[in-house]
């Protein structure tokens, strides 16, 4: 009898870390501005030509008490069909890599960005969104939320120098009066450059919510004018 109890306790202890690590309450959908990325990371900017739209950085599960990362050890499944690779690459390119060819796209270096996002973030929602679903649903969010169009509603366009408050309020209105997450990088002796904009959703991805104030990166943009590089 004691042996059975011991085995049950051991099983519970083994399963608990998975349950805790996978307990996410919301999702942050993060899109990046390619010119902003390259302004912040000039030595890493390898994609040519650069996309002229906001592209996906990732979909990041979290809860309201801590940031969730690397929740499980589930491996990434490489795409082997070029059309599948290209469809994902159109909205989720790796700006730190040149475009591959039909001959070498299967090499992990051309899928390492997706592998990183899956292992670091995707595994934290794996109990609800297995790998294929995680990537497809993230791309669907990109199709529904065009950040350039949202910014244009406030007459904010690439090449302009808006205030951080105007960018924040424009996105706020575009997503039904919910708080977004902005991220800027300030090059030496320059104005902060807009790099990323995040929109937060319920765990089911059905409803936009305020991005939690305790994890906002908007402070990286300062309080004045920012650069929206063209």
Task: Describe the predicted segments one by one.
Residues 8-9, 63, 125, 206:
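A broad, structure-centric signal for solvent-exposed, well-ordered loop/edge residues
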Residues 17-101, 106:
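Betabetaalpha-Me/HNH-type nuclease active-site subdomain
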Residues 95-230:
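C-terminal, well-folded lobe of enzymatic/effector domains
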Residues 7, 55, 219:
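Functionally constrained cores in energy, signaling, and assembly domains
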């Amino acid at each position: 009898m004691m042996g059975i109890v011991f085995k049950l306790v051991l099983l519970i202890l083994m399963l608990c870390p998975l349950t805790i690590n996978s307990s996410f309450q919301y999702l942050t959908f993060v899109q990046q501005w390619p010119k902003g990325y390259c302004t912040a990371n000039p030595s890493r900017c390898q994609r040519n030509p650069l996309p002229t739209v906001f592209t996906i950085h990732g979909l990041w599960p979290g809860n309201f008490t801590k940031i969730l990362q690397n929740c499980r050890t589930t491996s990434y499944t490489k795409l082997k069909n070029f059309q599948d690779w290209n469809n994902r690459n159109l909205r989720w390119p790796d700006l730190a890599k040149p475009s591959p060819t039909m001959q070498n796209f299967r090499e992990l270096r051309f899928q390492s960005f997706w592998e990183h996002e899956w292992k670091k973030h995707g595994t934290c929602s794996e109990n609800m969104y297995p790998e294929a679903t995680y990537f497809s649903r993230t791309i669907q969010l990109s199709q529904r939320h065009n950040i350039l169009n949202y910014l244009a509603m406030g007459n904010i366009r690439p090449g302009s120098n808006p205030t951080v408050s105007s960018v924040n309020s424009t996105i706020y209105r575009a997503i039904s009066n919910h708080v977004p997450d902005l991220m800027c990088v300030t090059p030496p002796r320059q104005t902060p450059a807009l790099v990323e904009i995040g929109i937060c959703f319920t765990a089911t991805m059905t409803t936009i919510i305020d991005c939690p104030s305790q994890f906002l990166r908007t402070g990286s943009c300062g309080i004045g004018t920012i650069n929206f590089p063209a």
